[in-house]
Structures are given as structure tokens and as C-alpha cells.
Amino acid sequence: MARFFRRRKFCRFTAEGVKEIDYKDLDTLKGYITETGKIVPSRITGTKARYQRQLATAIKRARYIAILPYTDSHFN
């Protein structure tokens, strides 16, 4: 039987030396949102708790000022 190799999770923000996550940085935020609009949990992304809290706050701020959608576009 073949064994599956799991890729080691790491925090991208720690590796890059990011101090604060900006709510205006949409390219970064979109990487942590599912196609339905949910915030991806840190156990899947590998993000540290400190940055996960900042990420959640930044996503919620971006949603509030209508930069990011709350949900997907509901087209059938």
C-alpha cells in the first residue's frame, strides 16, 4: 500500500515576518477564505493563533466595508 506524504503546515506570516495583517490586502485575505465565503480554520492553513485572530478581524473588516463578499455570488 502506498503511504501518503502530508506536507508540513507552516505559518506564512511568521516566515515572511509580517507584523500586522492589513484588511486592504485582498490578495492575502482571499487565500484564507473558501469559495463559499467562510474563513478557513488554522488547523487547515497552519497559521499561528496570533495571526489567525488578526486574519479573522481583517476579513470581517473587509466584509463590513464591502471589499470582500460575505458569501459567494449565488448564481445557478
UniProtKB/Swiss-Prot annotation:
Keyword S-adenosyl-L-methionine: no
Gene Ontology cellular component list: cytosolic small ribosomal subunit
PROSITE patterns: RIBOSOMAL_S18
GO biological process: translation
Domain of life: Bacteria
RNA-binding listed as a keyword: yes
UniProt-listed Pfam families: Ribosomal_S18
Signal peptide (from-to): none
Subunit structure, interactors included: Part of the 30S ribosomal subunit. Forms a tight heterodimer with protein bS6.
Family: Belongs to the bacterial ribosomal protein bS18 family.
Role of this protein: Binds as a heterodimer with protein bS6 to the central domain of the 16S rRNA, where it helps stabilize the platform of the 30S subunit.
Protein name (record): Small ribosomal subunit protein bS18
Organism: Marinomonas sp. (strain MWYL1)
